[in-house]
Amino acid sequence: MRRQLRRQSEQYGNIRPKPADAVLIGAGAGLSAAAGLTYSGERFERYFSDFREKYSITDIYSGGFYPFETLEEYWAWWSRHIFYNRYVDAPVPVYDKLLTAVKGTDYFVLTTNVEHQFQRAGFDKKRLFYTQGDYGLWQCSRACHDRTYDNEVTVRRMLDEQGDMKVPSELVPYCPVCGAPMTMNPTW
């Protein structure tokens, strides 16, 4: 698997755009998978084996839809899901190589990826459009208002303080406007 990811990364790293007025980069889940952000196999086992054993969840994506009994369990899952996909650099430098390939050109990125690896690699934030949201943001589950909220500090605390696949109740995020539980920003 690693050899295949490395080979794919090298292929992406050798792409050189032809002269053009502008470059539009379209990217989906395949780019992140090539960068090593896989949702199954060894990576899933490393971070989520306890959830697999208790709930029979088979991969990271499917776990996002699991009907956990408590918000403490829900946020234990999601804090790991968010952290290991949004706040950790991709293991294979696909995004870095893509940035090198378009450096000095007028580019724009349109992506369905929600883990913001483009920003982590140094792509200009003003040249990115994430059609399906951002793992780094929460929003009201009732949509009582349009604001989103950065979650990094709380996600890191949830990760540090969780035990037995639960976060402490005081870390469960609630909407500051209506009091409903917060939810993820991705819009799938």
Report each predicted region and the residues it spans.
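Conserved catalytic core of sirtuin-type NAD+-dependent deacylases
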Residues: M1-W188
